[in-house]
Amino acid sequence: MSAQDVENAVEAALDPSVGPIIKQQATDFIGSLRSSSTGWKICHEIFSEKTKYKPSTRLICLQTLSEKVREWNNESNLLELQMIRDSVWSYIKELSFLDEPAYISNAVQHLLTLLFLQLYPSNWNDFFASLQGVIAASSQSEFSNFYLKVLLSIGDEIADSLVLKTDVQIQKDNLVKDAIRANDMSDIVSFVYEMMLAYSNAKNYGTVGLCLQVYAQWVSWININLIVNEPCMNLLYSFLQIEELRCAACETMTEIVNKKMKPLEKLNLLNILNLNLFFSKSQEQSTDPNFDEHVAKLINAQGVELVAIKSDPSELSPELKENCSFQLYNLFPYLIRYLSDDYDETSTAVFPFLSDLLVSLRKESSSKELSASLKEFLKSLLEAIIKKMKYDESQEWDDDPDSEEEAEFQEMRKKLKIFQDTINSIDSSLFSSYMYSAITSSLSTAATLSPENSWQLIEFALYETYIFGEGLRGPDAFFNEVDKSPTVLSQILALVTTSQVCRHPHPLVQLLYMEILVRYASFFDYESAAIPALIEYFVGPRGIHNTNERVRPRAWYLFYRFVKSIKKQVVNYTESSLAMLGDLLNISVSPVTDMDAPVPTLNSSIRNSDFNSQLYLFETVGVLISSGNLTPEEQALYCDSLINALIGKANAALSSDLSALENIISVYCSLMAIGNFAKGFPARGSEEVAWLASFNKASDEIFLILDRMGFNEDIRGAVRFTSGRIINVVGPDMLPKVPQLISILLNSIDMNELVDVLSFISQLIHIYKDNMMEITNRMLPTLLMRIFSSLSAAPQGTDDAVKQNDLRKSYISFILQLLNKGFGSILFTEENQVYFDPLINSILHFANLVGEPATQKSSIALVSKMVSLWGGKDGIAGFENFTLSLTPLCFEMPVNPNFNTRDGQSLVVLGELAGLQKIILEKLGDIYKSYLVTVYFPTVNFPDVMASEYLQALSNLDSRSFKQFFQKFIQALKSGNV
């Protein structure tokens, strides 16, 4: 490997005309240069021979040298570090960086920084003095800029709190900072000040800006008096008046204010800075939004500090408390001014101050009445918040769900809502009165404007209405408890629903209007006269027939929610609603690709359609048919009509290529539509209902579909879903078909589906109870074989591991349900007896899975249930030996080094183990005690005294007390304190 080889490799790697194979070889060569123990020498050679090699090659070499310098130890690699330092220092003294590209100069600065960190102070104690000497010898600003950028680079390395570092690195950085503070800090700050003064007089504001950056970056860890002194502060104040420097000066002031100090010291600092004079001059809207944002950040910093000082429990004299409050109150006008700013970046800059202030005022209001001036301030805050809550007059709503600007606005709204909520908690009467006025005046003003100019006001009024009663439930939300008069929320809702808002053409207004109707649907229990108009709105062109692609599918869901919420009142509008829904029940999903699926799939096709939202319409139809005032004949007719149409669509697809994606989509969508239609019907009771025949017929057709297309996982999933919904509707009518259904499902099942199948069978057991016992007995061998096979397979990546974990949980839960439902006897039948030992072993394996506390807990609970059912003299023959064999689980698993007894979930596991021991004792009594004393405890060398104490606790303490004892016992055992 030679220097020329490196240059050739860099050229090849960067040349767009070079083929991919050569380019990869070149990249690999550069990688080997960096990883090689001697590659740095070639890089050093290339850097030293400045004129011989191209800048791109030298950049790669500088980066490689930087990596090595960072890796090296300043003791074992001292010679190498000094060699590179000497070369870099020669480069700097020769002013070589003046005619270099900026990226080379930056790389040299970074390398110099890393050398400094390795060698300062013991092997390079004159670093700053030497560098300042070189800079002072030249009048060119480029030298000064180089020096200042090195200081900034040092600050990035040792004082950036956002960079995660090891404790060793933090300690090393602190040693460097201590050395700088002790040896060089005063000279550095003075040198930078002199540069700042000289270059500001020369109007070289670029270099002055770098000086300010250094002050801003370094002030957090240096003596504050080095910067906060009369000459320096006068200079900084003057920069606040210079357009080119005022933003940088603001940043420096902000960092000075942010410096961590004791409350009393910070208050004195803020008194010295006296920034209110500057704020008062900056109040008017400037022509520079960037400067306004910087001023807002400075106000925010001072406000946060003052609130913290005011809230600090440490004792301040009455005079200082008054001074702090005075400074804080003087900030209020500036807070409101910048909170109200037209630019969101400026407004959000004061959010932390506002948040802390409101929390402080809430605490204050809990112990005393707020003053009139503070209440006026809260009103001013609400006025500013409301201004920011509104869309700008010139702004249009972007209905693209991926719009970044819209997302940012909604995120800001969430934060503003928190401020509103806090003000409400401070003074609910003031808040309610103000918001009522704001909402009503917005609606009144909007009524005088054209639709294109009024939507922002109406949207604001509706949005505030939507969030106003969030969390309120029951009659108290709408009527005052004392005199039963309407609450403010009730008055607002009455105004909104009787206004002309519902006629507004803007899609966002239409959407919010429906959201309000759904959120406050219980309001119409008391205002039922409004329901006909609301139903008409929902089923009309502004609701479920909306032309807006974003509003329409949301309206389908909202109509479903509304109908479900007012089921009792909807009976009189069933036929008209069903008539308006008819044209929306045609399913049209075509094969489509997307970013996640370059080839069309069922999932990509569904994702890129409105089908999942359309399913709510099918459920809504079910709710309307079953809850309305239709005759049984009409109910049956509607059900037959819809189900026949969906089955017909599926059968049409079955008549051609079953593997064609469009046919799979058609069958899948038809099945899911039937399932969601069934969801709208109540669970079958004892009475006969008109729709039973329709759903029984549907179940027969679904079996035929499963028989034809059971090879497809998505179809199997749809059949499970739909069958589960139909079973809920038809009840025992479905029972004779269940064995065939389960048999077909199990024939083609894979691990992805096992969790769903277990859930499906659990649902059947819950519905059909003892009638499912024989069916479960027959299908259990196949099911267990599938489960054991899936759980024993090595996971092929993270997704497989997650699926296996989910299957473990479902499997344990399923077996526990069998026992809880009285199905435990099927585990001992002739068909299943052979699987009993593998089942027991699998549960014990899961109980010992250290690092999976949730799995352990449920597994141990299952074992406890088994012992409770089958242990003792009346239990199953031979189960006593198994019960005694559980003892190591109770004692040896918890002392595993990886079992964290301080973790909350692990303590729950210990609690389950304690419960297991109490159950074993209950079932075996003296047999268990004797086993512990004569067999187990001697085997593990338990001292006799400890064994005796343990048995006493086990025998005499109640379950709760023993759980606490056992948890402490295991913790002590692991720490060696027993």
From Swiss-Prot:
GO cellular component terms given for this protein: cytoplasm; cytosol; nuclear envelope; nuclear matrix; nuclear pore; nucleus
Protein location: Nucleus; Cytoplasm
A GO molecular function held by the record: tRNA binding
Record-linked Pfam families: Exportin-T, Xpo1
Keyword line: Cytoplasm, Nucleus, RNA-binding, Transport, tRNA processing, tRNA-binding
Keyword RNA-binding on entry: yes
Primary location recorded for the protein, binned into one broad class: nucleus
One GO biological process term: tRNA export from nucleus
Stored PANTHER family: EXPORTIN-T (PTHR15952:SF11), EXPORTIN-T/LOS1 (PTHR15952)
Protein role: tRNA nucleus export receptor which facilitates tRNA translocation across the nuclear pore complex. Involved in pre-tRNA splicing, probably by affecting the interaction of pre-tRNA with splicing endonuclease.
Similarity remark: Belongs to the exportin family.
Protein name per Swiss-Prot or TrEMBL: Exportin-T
